[in-house]
Amino acid sequence: MLSLMMALGIVSRIGSGFIADMIGGTATLLIGSFMQGVALLLYLYFNGLESLFIVSGIFGLFQGGIVPMYAVICRELLPPRRAGAAIGLAVSATIFGMAFGGYFSGVIFDLTSSYRMAFLNGLLWNAFNLAIVSWLFWRGRRRQPVGELLAA
């Protein structure tokens, strides 16, 4: 199951790059984060082996392209002299969040003996991510992209 998820995550990373070239990093991240949330929601309703493989595949198709979009967004929204530090901060926060999130969901499972609550925890954090990305998307549509300013 994990191998399937990771293999499709590779497809997601490459595909997200192509999509970002067409619609931008923020829009791509918004789509990927939303679809990752849908996949997390599906985990709540399926528990058979076959269905878990299918849901894991769906999850892999969307989660793999999320982290690379943080670097794309930093470069889209920031001047080159600030983008490097912002990318480092974004990736560090992502790594911390994944490490803490996995641990915290394990604690939730240990306390409740339920994967349902652990996946709900993931959905809450996904909603938080979607709120931030939605704000960036809305804000970015009102401003001229840095790339256009530099080209002028």
Model-derived regions: residue spans:
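Intracellular juxtamembrane helix-capping segments at the cytosolic ends
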Residues: G65-L78
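C-terminal ends and interior cores of transmembrane alpha-helices
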Residues: F34-N47
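Paired small-residue
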Residues: A39, E50-F59
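Symmetry-related core transmembrane helices of the 12-TM Major Facilitator Superfamily/SLC fold
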Residues: M117-L136
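Loop-to-transmembrane helix entry/capping segments in MFS-fold secondary transporters
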Residues: P80-A90
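Residue-level signature of mid-helix packing/kink "hotspots" within the transmembrane helices
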Residues: M6-I14, G64, I95-A99
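Interfacial helix-cap and linker-helix signal at transmembrane-aqueous boundaries
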Residues: I19-A20, F104-S113
